[in-house]
Structures are given as C-alpha cells and as structure tokens.
C-alpha cells in the first residue's frame, strides 16, 4: 500500500517538476528518497543546493515521513544531525500539540514548507539553540555578521558537495520550469466545487424554463 502511494506521488513530481527541488528514488527501497532543496531567492540561503533524505514509515500516509538534511545546515529549527523540526512533519500527539500533519498532505507541500522555513524560522521552540541565539541577535541588529556568515558558509559547502549535473539541472529549471504552488491541491478542489455549482445552477435554470413553457401553454 505504501509503495502504491509513493509511486503515485513520485510520478506526479516527475511529471510536474519544480525549480525549487529535485527528488530521486532509491531503486532498492521505494521508501527512501533523495532530495535537493534550492535555497529561496532573496534570502541568506539563496544559491544553496541542500541535500536531504526522506524516509517513509510503513503506515504512510497516516504517519508523516522523516526529512533529514545530509548537507550541513545552520538554522534554528534544524538539529545538528540534520533532522528538521517543523509542524507538518509531526505525527505523535499532533492534535494535542496543534500540529498540522494529515494523510492528505503531499510531498511537494512538505518540501515547499521546509524551504519556506529556511527564511522564516521559529525561535520559540528551537532545535539548534546556538543558531537560534545567533539568529535573534541578527534580527535585533545586535550582531549582523555571525549568523549570515555561518549560513553563507553552508551555502558554499552545499555547492561544493553537489555534482555538476545537479547544478546544471537547477540552472535549467530556473528558466524553463515553473515552481509547483504550495496550494495546488486546494486550487484543484476549488475548481471542482465551482464546476459543480455551475452545473447545478444550469440544471435549475432549465427546469424553470420548462415550467414557464408549460404555464404558457
């Protein structure tokens, strides 16, 4: 069952590529994916190509996957071992903690959420305390050099660890491939609802016209 879900999602991502990330599957294990996330434009992470792995549990999609960066990261919500602390990937006691994982979440939504997190960290519950402290000093203009310097170091390191093929992929994607919007699935559902309304409305109009014709007769 897990493989069926993952095959469908992987097919969707390969048929609708994004300039923001690249995914590949472990041929020997469908539940392990390799990912490269592109640092968001106009942020300290711009230009970085950060590698990560996604691991899917046996009961996916009813339990969230795990995303772990293999590239070195300097961020308040990323542990030193690369694990990401973000609500969308929390499963245990999610309802009690106000977390947002649900089986309808898609992989592209997860990846775009992680990319967004890079520039919008949550310092209230940091995974990396030192990075959180440095980020706060940066935001409050107490130290404008330390945090950016560490981030830019990881950006450079991520590029050094990327293959020329991966770098070329993102260069081409930036000019040829539109990004996948994070609300793509919501838009599709809204369109379906609109179409249903139009059909229902037209049917009612036809019934009213028929009634009027009968009255005239």
From Swiss-Prot:
Accepts ubiquitin from the E1 complex and catalyzes its covalent attachment to other proteins. Performs the second step in the ubiquitination reaction that targets specifically a protein for degradation via the proteasome. By controlling the ubiquitination status of specific host proteins, the virus may target them to degradation and thereby optimize the viral replication. May be implicated in the shutoff of protein synthesis through its interactions with components of the host translation machinery. Residues 1-160 form the UBC core domain. Keywords: ATP-binding, Early protein, Host cytoplasm, Host nucleus, Late protein, Nucleotide-binding, Transferase, Ubl conjugation pathway, Virion. Binds Mn2+ ion which is required for highest activity. Can also utilize Mg2+ ions. SUPFAM superfamilies: UBC-like. Pathway: Protein modification; protein ubiquitination. It holds the Pfam family UQ_con. Interacts with host 40S ribosomal protein RPS23. Interacts with host translation initiation factor EIF4E. Interacts with host E3 ubiquitin ligase CUL4B. Interacts with host RNF138. It catalyses: S-ubiquitinyl-[E1 ubiquitin-activating enzyme]-L-cysteine + [E2 ubiquitin-conjugating enzyme]-L-cysteine = [E1 ubiquitin-activating enzyme]-L-cysteine + S-ubiquitinyl-[E2 ubiquitin-conjugating enzyme]-L-cysteine. One of its GO terms (biological process) is protein ubiquitination. The active site is at residue 85. It comes from African swine fever virus (isolate Tick/South Africa/Pretoriuskop Pr4/1996) (ASFV). This is Ubiquitin-conjugating enzyme E2.
């Amino acid at each position: 069952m897990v493989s069926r879900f993952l095959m469908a999602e992987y097919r969707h991502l390969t048929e609708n590529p994004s300039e923001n990330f690249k995914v590949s599957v472990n041929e020997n294990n469908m539940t392990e994916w390799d990912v490269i996330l592109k640092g968001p434009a106009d942020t300290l992470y711009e230009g970085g190509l950060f590698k990560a792995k996604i691991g899917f549990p046996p009961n996916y999609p009813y339990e969230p996957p795990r995303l772990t960066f293999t590239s070195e990261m300097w961020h308040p919500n990323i542990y030193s071992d690369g694990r990401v602390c973000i609500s969308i990937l929390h499963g245990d006691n999610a309802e009690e903690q106000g977390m947002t994982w649900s089986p309808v979440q898609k992989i592209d939504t997860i990846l775009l959420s992680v990319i967004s997190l890079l520039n919008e960290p949550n310092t209230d519950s940091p995974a990396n305390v030192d990075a959180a402290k440095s980020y706060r000093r940066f935001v409050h203009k107490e130290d404008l050099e330390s945090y950016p310097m560490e981030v830019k170091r990881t950006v450079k390191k991520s590029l050094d660890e990327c293959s020329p093929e991966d770098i070329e992929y993102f260069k081409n994607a930036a000019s040829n491939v539109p990004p996948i919007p994070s609300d793509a699935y919501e838009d599709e559902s809204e369109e379906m609802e609109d179409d249903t309304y139009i059909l229902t409305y037209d049917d009612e109009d036809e019934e009213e016209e028929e009634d009027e014709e009968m009255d005239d007769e």
